[in-house]
């Protein structure tokens, strides 16, 4: 009988140590997740060195080293839009792109909702989250959708004049501040 008691006590001590080790491991995982989340969502200040007035009446200030491609394009979904991209090759793993379309409230019934539905149909789980963006003289509604190793950023920028800028962007997880800075520099000409 004393042998069984010693055996049970030793087993309980091992179990307690194992549970303590598991708790420490879980806590370290939580801390690592928080640190990574803060790094990914850091707000890097913008240093725009280029101003561009697009044909569609949208102006943007941007960093030419980050956005070397700035041009008007015809997009299948958005039509005539201003495109800023990190390069010409969309197959590049670090490729990021933002499209700006000017319209009014009637251009889309629910731009963000429709875009989320399209992304969900194409990629499955997209995990949309609201993003707080500020554009001077406008009301901004924006979401960030997590798509595997990428973020899709969708926004509507509504001006008092009735004009609306529709924004669609795609970036790597660590580069979301590049798109945030770009969107926050938008104005109408």
For the regions a protein language model found, what residue spans apply to each?
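Surface-exposed amphipathic alpha-helical segments
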Residues: 64-67, 160-189
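Conserved polar/disulfide-associated segments of primarily extracytoplasmic proteins
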Residues: 18, 72-165, 170-174
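N-terminal Lys/Arg-rich, disordered targeting/topogenic segments
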Residues: 1-16
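Hydrophobic membrane-insertion alpha-helices, especially the h-region
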Residues: 20-37
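N-terminal "mature-domain start" segment
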Residues: 42-79
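Short, compositionally biased strand/turn segments
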Residues: 33-53, 103-108
């Amino acid at each position: 009988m004393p042998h069984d008691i010693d055996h049970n006590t030793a087993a309980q001590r091992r179990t307690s140590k194992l549970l303590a080790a598991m708790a420490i491991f879980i806590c370290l995982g939580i801390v690592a997740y928080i640190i990574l989340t803060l790094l990914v969502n850091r707000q890097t200040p913008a240093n725009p060195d280029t101003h561009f007035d697009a044909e569609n009446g949208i102006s943007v200030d941007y960093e030419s080293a980050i956005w070397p491609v700035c041009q008007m394009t015809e997009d299948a979904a958005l039509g005539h839009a201003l495109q800023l991209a990190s390069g010409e090759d969309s197959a590049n793993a670090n490729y990021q792109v933002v499209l700006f379309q000017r319209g009014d409230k009637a251009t889309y019934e629910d731009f963000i909702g429709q875009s989320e539905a399209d992304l969900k149909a194409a990629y499955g789980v997209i995990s949309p989250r609201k993003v707080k963006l500020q554009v001077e003289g406008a009301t901004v509604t924006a979401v960030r959708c997590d798509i595997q190793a990428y973020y899709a950023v969708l926004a509507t920028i509504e001006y008092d004049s009735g004009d609306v800028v529709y924004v669609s962007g795609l970036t790597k997880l660590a580069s979301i501040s590049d798109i945030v800075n770009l969107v926050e520099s938008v104005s109408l000409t």
